[in-house]
Structure formats: structure tokens, C-alpha cells
Amino acid sequence: MAAGALRGLPVAGGGESSESEDDCWEIGYLDRTSQKLKGLLPIEEKKEKFKKAMTIGDVSLIQELLDSGISVDSTFQYGWTPLMYAASVANAELVRVLLDSGANASFEKDKQTILITACSARGSEEQILKCVELLLSRNADPNVACRRLMTPIMYAARDGHTQVVALLVAHGAEVNTQDENGYTALTWAARQGHKNIVLKLLELGANKMLQTKDGKMPSEIAKRNKHHEIFNLLSFTLNPLEGKLQQLTKEDTICKILTTDSDREKDHIFSSYTAFGDLEVFLHGIGLEHLTDLLKERDITLRHLLTMREDEFTKNGITSEDQQKILATLKELQVEEIQFGELSEEIKLEISGDEFLNFLLKLNKQCGHLITAVQNIITELPVNSQKITLEWASPRNFTSVCEELVNNVEDLSEEVCKLKDVIQKLQNERENDPTHIQLREEVSTWNSRILKRTAITVCGFGFLLFICKLTFQRK
């Protein structure tokens, strides 16, 4: 009896009989036929070896222990299974071994699924993508949410894994699901500043108008987190990318998502009109039509072109001369945002007349750009709704935004009138001050003229927006 007990104790590696297959792993039991050893000590020892093998990622030892009878769904600390642990470290080879041994890909602990664990893993995107692909191939549900109502695609978007996001959508993940705070995958990507994720989600049909529980859209979230490039991208009126992949089959979508750049150049599966019609118009309008084929080959849309940085221009083969043309055109088209955080430092009592005049001129120029932009939109809008080619959301969305614009313009007009009254009051006081040396009449007349032009411009802009609003309501 004592001898039997001694035979069951762990021994040093290499001390087993020659028949043992576990010499190098120090499994340490000799009598495999003993029911007592099978029921008690060997199983506990195997579990301990299994945990250590999982920790160091020893796939061959894990496979050996699984073959010896260790349960593939045995639980570790916090109730995690081996598969969940392997997914958390993005060990694709280990995930494959465990799945092939029958591990449950749909296991969850406290509303934490293995797929969510894989999507939020710390590792290379290549390894995470392989893990996610393996789990999806074993029917892991991509729409099961955690306790915070976050789904796998939200975690992937938050962490910047573009290919993982696309793969999840190809397997049925809902793009516009919202978590407990009203965040979508697009909102998370905008918050974290992942431009490529934002572009991909728009292409996959993400709704950029969905608001969080505190009433913020993805563009506003991006702006609040100082991701101005993404803010401009999401604020762009046209959206040729939206829903671009929604009509494809699952197989075609996966093929499109996972092909290399060279494959995309060889096999471009989308309609050039749908993806590049507006781009061609833009390029022809500024005399750069020779760039059309180049941008098509690289799958660059107008939205992407308008948000490119200088290094991206060079990387995509756009010459310095062409870059200057594009940037010059954008400077004319875009309304430069006034940094009001800086105005508090500029508008002081010591401000010179020239500086204040420059501020008013800049404000007037901004209003002029806005008026031109609205005029262009009005002339470009089709009179008949049947002539609208691109996919449009409900006109009610546009009408509500126009109403808000009209209100903002009215507020701006009111504030400009207040500014004019304050300046007029200061001017009258100075004219009545006997100690003040009068300026030349020409300067006074010029300042008054600038104020009048500013007020007229703002009122004119409000009138144009009112006309635009009526146009949408008529439609």
C-alpha cells in the first residue's frame, strides 16, 4: 500500500520508467493503471501542468495533456476557460488547437464572450484577425454584447483593427448597434481617432447621424477629442462610401476585405460611377483628370482625397504640382474654422484698430464663403427627386439641419447687430470727448462701411438658408 502511494508521488523529470511518454514534461506519475491515481492526484497534477503550459504557450504540451484526458473546457481563475485565455493573448495557434479539441467557441463568463475577448486582446492585428476568424468559423455570435452592451465590432473599432471590423460585418455583425451610452462602432472609432476605421465603417453602412445618450453625433465626438480630420470627414455632405458593401454577398464581402492591394488593382469589383463619379467631376473641374486612373487603382474616394495629408499625397504618387492645385482648391472651398479659444487672447482692451478690423474682415470673408457654398448647393440640387442618383437619407434630416442653420444665422445676425451698436456707442463717445483728437473722416467712413457690409452679408446668408429650407420642404 505504501509502495503504491510512493509510486504516485511526483518525481523529477527523467526519473520515470522507460515506458513513460512524459519524461520531458515532468508529469511525474508512474502507475497509469491505478484507479486511485487516475481519480485523484494525476488529474490535479495534469491540471496544474495544463495551467503552466497555457501560461507559457506550450502548444505541444497542451495537445499532449488534452490527449491524456484533460477537459478542454476546464476552468481557471475567474472562471475562464483555456480558449478564453488563449483568445485574450491572441495566440492563434493555441486557439486552433483548443477548437479542434472541441472547445466551446460560444462560452461566456459574466457576459464576456470569447469573441469579445479576442477583439479586445493585446497583440498584433494579424494574430487577432486569425483568432476572430477561427471563432467565427465555429459559429461564435458576433452580435452578443457584454454587460456594457458593447459588441465585438465596437471593441475592434475602439482598438483600431480595420480588418477585424470588416470581417465581423461580413459574418453578420450589426454596424449600428449602440452600447449603454449610445456609442456605435463609428462613434468609438471617431473618439479614438482611427481614420481608416471610420472610412471602412462608412463603407459598410454605418449611420453617422446616430447620437449618443447625451445627444452627440460621431463628428462631434471626434471634434471634442481634437480629431479634426475625422470631424471634417464626417461633416462632409456627400457620402459616396456609405453602404457600399451592403449589397454584396458574404463571400464577396470577405474577398473584398481581405484582398491585398495588388489584388484590388487587378480586380476592382465596384461600379466606378458609384465610387468615383463625384471624384471625376472634382478632378476635371481643377484640370487634374489625369489623376483619375491613379486614384481608382488605389481605391481613393473624394472623401479620402479631401482629408489627405502631405505625406499621403506623396505616398500615393501625386506630384508636388498637383498637390498644390488640390490644396489651393480646398483652401477656396473649405471654410476655415475660427479658433475661438485663441480669440480670448486677442480681443483685449489693448487690441489695435487694425487687428480688430482684420478680425471683422475675416469674419465677413467666412460669411461670404458660406453664402457661396449654399448658393452652389441650391443650384446643384435636382428639382425632381427622381433625378437623385446617390442614396439619400430621409429629407426630414436635411430639413431639420436647415432649420437649425437658420436659427444659428438669426442668432449670429443678432450678435453682429449688438456688436455694431457697441462700436457705434464707442464711436459716439469718442466724437463727443473734447480731449480726443478726431481721426480722418475717411477712416471712420471705411470702418462704418465694413460693419454695414458684415451685417448685410449675415442677413443675406440667413435669407439664402431660408430659401434652402423652403426648397427641402417643397421636396
Curated annotation (Swiss-Prot):
<feature type="domain" description="SAM">
    <location>
        <begin position="272"/>
        <end position="334"/>
    </location>
</feature>
<dbReference type="GO" id="GO:0010526">
    <property type="term" value="P:transposable element silencing"/>
</dbReference>
<feature type="region of interest" description="Disordered">
    <location>
        <begin position="1"/>
        <end position="22"/>
    </location>
</feature>
<dbReference type="InterPro" id="IPR013761">
    <property type="entry name" value="SAM/pointed_sf"/>
</dbReference>
<feature type="repeat" description="ANK 2">
    <location>
        <begin position="78"/>
        <end position="107"/>
    </location>
</feature>
<comment type="subunit">
    <text>Interacts with DDX4, PIWIL1, RANBP9 and TDRD1.</text>
</comment>
<dbReference type="GO" id="GO:0071546">
    <property type="term" value="C:pi-body"/>
</dbReference>
<protein>
    <recommendedName>
        <fullName>Ankyrin repeat, SAM and basic leucine zipper domain-containing protein 1</fullName>
    </recommendedName>
</protein>
<feature type="modified residue" description="Phosphoserine">
    <location>
        <position position="20"/>
    </location>
</feature>
<dbReference type="InterPro" id="IPR036770">
    <property type="entry name" value="Ankyrin_rpt-contain_sf"/>
</dbReference>
<keyword id="KW-0677">Repeat</keyword>
<feature type="repeat" description="ANK 1">
    <location>
        <begin position="45"/>
        <end position="74"/>
    </location>
</feature>
<keyword id="KW-0943">RNA-mediated gene silencing</keyword>
<keyword id="KW-0597">Phosphoprotein</keyword>
<dbReference type="GO" id="GO:0030154">
    <property type="term" value="P:cell differentiation"/>
</dbReference>
<dbReference type="InterPro" id="IPR002110">
    <property type="entry name" value="Ankyrin_rpt"/>
</dbReference>
<feature type="repeat" description="ANK 3">
    <location>
        <begin position="110"/>
        <end position="144"/>
    </location>
</feature>
<keyword id="KW-0217">Developmental protein</keyword>
<dbReference type="Pfam" id="PF07647">
    <property type="entry name" value="SAM_2"/>
</dbReference>
<keyword id="KW-0744">Spermatogenesis</keyword>
<dbReference type="GO" id="GO:0007283">
    <property type="term" value="P:spermatogenesis"/>
</dbReference>
<feature type="modified residue" description="Phosphoserine">
    <location>
        <position position="17"/>
    </location>
</feature>
<feature type="modified residue" description="Phosphoserine">
    <location>
        <position position="18"/>
    </location>
</feature>
<comment type="function">
    <text>Plays a central role during spermatogenesis by repressing transposable elements and preventing their mobilization, which is essential for the germline integrity. Acts via the piRNA metabolic process, which mediates the repression of transposable elements during meiosis by forming complexes composed of piRNAs and Piwi proteins and governs the methylation and subsequent repression of transposons. Its association with pi-bodies suggests a participation in the primary piRNAs metabolic process.</text>
</comment>
<feature type="repeat" description="ANK 4">
    <location>
        <begin position="148"/>
        <end position="177"/>
    </location>
</feature>
<feature type="repeat" description="ANK 6">
    <location>
        <begin position="214"/>
        <end position="243"/>
    </location>
</feature>
<dbReference type="GO" id="GO:0031047">
    <property type="term" value="P:regulatory ncRNA-mediated gene silencing"/>
</dbReference>
<dbReference type="InterPro" id="IPR042650">
    <property type="entry name" value="Asz1_SAM"/>
</dbReference>
<dbReference type="GO" id="GO:0007140">
    <property type="term" value="P:male meiotic nuclear division"/>
</dbReference>
<keyword id="KW-0469">Meiosis</keyword>
<keyword id="KW-0963">Cytoplasm</keyword>
<keyword id="KW-0221">Differentiation</keyword>
<dbReference type="Pfam" id="PF00023">
    <property type="entry name" value="Ank"/>
</dbReference>
<keyword id="KW-0040">ANK repeat</keyword>
<dbReference type="Pfam" id="PF12796">
    <property type="entry name" value="Ank_2"/>
</dbReference>
<dbReference type="InterPro" id="IPR001660">
    <property type="entry name" value="SAM"/>
</dbReference>
<feature type="repeat" description="ANK 5">
    <location>
        <begin position="181"/>
        <end position="210"/>
    </location>
</feature>
